[in-house]
Amino acid sequence: MKIVQETISTKTKKNIAIIISRYNNFINQHLLDGALDILKRIGQINQKNIPIIHVPGAYEIPIIASIISKQKKYNAIIALGTIIKGHTLHYSHISHAVNSGLTNISITNNIPISIGIITANNIEQAIERAGTKLGNKGSEAALTALEMINIINILAQNK
């Protein structure tokens, strides 16, 4: 049995697009900072190879991810945002639509889309997941993107 497993490495040139929601920007900026730190420091990716596309809210992320994925210029996409539960069902609908949309785009277009979108019951939970107590979901998304690029490269070489 062959096991395909890869670490985060800097073997190949990588182009990774980041799509980030402006809604809840005070939280999302921490996600972006975490992602960029990982991509530059660990991934050794040049800033010019990391376009950052700002969209109004999390709901708008999938359409931009779809357009970017079809360009075939990027090895991965990182989606960043924050969806906070309110007193309506809006939170549930948005969360489901965004995650389903990104998953479908990833599978359809064979590009890893790393989801660093916080879904939280309240603003305190969101802040904790953006780098205070519970790690940084932006950093985690960047690490996942780097690892997925390497796994896909290994699978492509072993055809």
UniProtKB/Swiss-Prot annotation:
Pfam family, one: DMRL_synthase
Domain of life of the organism encoding this protein: Bacteria
Reaction it catalyzes: (2S)-2-hydroxy-3-oxobutyl phosphate + 5-amino-6-(D-ribitylamino)uracil = 6,7-dimethyl-8-(1-D-ribityl)lumazine + phosphate + 2 H2O + H(+)
Gene3D superfamilies assigned: Lumazine/riboflavin synthase
UniProt xrefs under CDD domains: Lumazine_synthase-I
Entry EC number(s): 2.5.1.78
InterPro entries cross-referenced by the UniProt entry: LS, LS/RS, LS/RS_sf
Residues binding (2S)-2-hydroxy-3-oxobutyl phosphate, per UniProt: R129
GO biological process, one term: riboflavin biosynthetic process
An example Gene Ontology CC term for this record: cytosol
Active site per database record: H90 (proton donor)
Binding residues for 5-amino-6-(D-ribitylamino)uracil: Y23, A58, Y59, E60, T82, I83, I84, I115
GO MF terms, alphabetically ordered: 6,7-dimethyl-8-ribityllumazine synthase activity
Pathway annotation: Cofactor biosynthesis; riboflavin biosynthesis; riboflavin from 2-hydroxy-3-oxobutyl phosphate and 5-amino-6-(D-ribitylamino)uracil: step 1/2
Function per UniProt: Catalyzes the formation of 6,7-dimethyl-8-ribityllumazine by condensation of 5-amino-6-(D-ribitylamino)uracil with 3,4-dihydroxy-2-butanone 4-phosphate. This is the penultimate step in the biosynthesis of riboflavin.
Subunit structure: Forms an icosahedral capsid composed of 60 subunits, arranged as a dodecamer of pentamers.
Protein name according to UniProt: 6,7-dimethyl-8-ribityllumazine synthase
Organism (species): Buchnera aphidicola subsp. Baizongia pistaciae (strain Bp)
Gene from which this protein is expressed: ribH
